[in-house]
Regions:
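Detector for methionine-enriched segments
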Residues: 1, 8, 85, 100, ...
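Non-catalytic N-terminal targeting/anchoring module and adjacent flexible stem/linker
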Residues: 1-14, 210
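Intrinsic low-complexity, intrinsically disordered segments enriched in polar/basic residues
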Residues: 2-4, 25, 147, 154
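N-terminal start-of-chain detector that recognizes signal peptides
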Residues: 4-6, 16-20, 43, 106-109, ...
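Alpha-helical protein-protein interaction elements
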Residues: 7-9, 54, 88, 178
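SAM cofactor-binding core of SAM-dependent methyltransferases
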Residues: 17-113, 120, 141-143
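Conserved acidic-Pro-Pro-aromatic motif
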Residues: 47, 108-111, 117-210
Length: 210
């Protein structure tokens, strides 16, 4: 198995039992999320950037199939319409708008952010509305020195993390996301080539020593 195909792995020994559950879409993330759901029993799932679910598995599709309330956001109209046809029990919205989260019990939720661009700023908007049990946020770690710190004049640094460079959306690197989300009370428990998985700190004892 090449590095680009390696499964999601736990970041610390105390979470190493999760490695045995790394299976399924995309690099084993779904299997680890399923293991976490067995511990935390979420009552809500939110996927922002759910267009992959048009033809590929939804990351949290296993919870939708179990009847857990699911809210999907997909900006692309064609993909959105396809989701409405194939995921009929989900609540489906277009562009992400944090106001759509009003009234939802985020404290009992799993949230996935996968928009190929402004992932961290969107994740932060979610965190300002509530504190999910689990958050998985897409990252991008292949900047290279030519991209530097990515802080152009006139733009707040956090929004720079989604700018286009040569037509490619620059996403926050994993270390940057981990540093920023720590302030909200989360710990990185596992990481794949493209996703970082975080758990709310008060729930960590549930995962230790398993």
């Amino acid at each position: 198995m090449t590095d680009t195909q390696s499964p999601m792995v736990a970041t610390e020994l105390r979470f190493a039992w999760l490695n045995d559950r790394a299976d399924g879409w995309q690099f084993g993330e779904t299997g680890i999320l399923e293991a976490l759901s067995e511990r935390f029993d979420p009552g809500l799932t939110v996927e922002i950037g759910a267009g992959d679910g048009q033809s590929l598995p939804l990351t949290l599709g296993f919870l939708l199939e179990k009847g857990v309330k699911t809210v999907l956001f997909e900006a692309d109209e064609l993909r959105q319409n396809a989701l409405k046809m194939t995921r009929k029990t989900a609540v489906i919205h277009g562009f992400f708008d944090a106001r759509m989260l009003d009234g939802l019990e985020l404290s009992q939720s799993f949230v996935v952010v996968d928009v190929d661009g402004q992932d961290w700023p969107i994740a932060e908007e979610v965190l300002r509305c509530g504190k999910p049990q689990v958050m998985m946020i897409e990252h991008y770690d292949e900047f290279g020195p030519r991209y530097g710190r990515c802080e152009p004049e006139g733009l707040p640094p956090r929004w720079c993390l989604g700018l286009l460079v040569d037509g490619f959306p620059i996403q926050a690197p994993a270390k940057e996301i981990e540093k920023r989300i720590r302030w909200y009370g989360y710990t990185l428990i596992a990481k794949s080539r493209v996703n970082s998985l975080f758990v709310r700190n008060d729930l960590l004892p549930t995962l230790e020593g398993c």
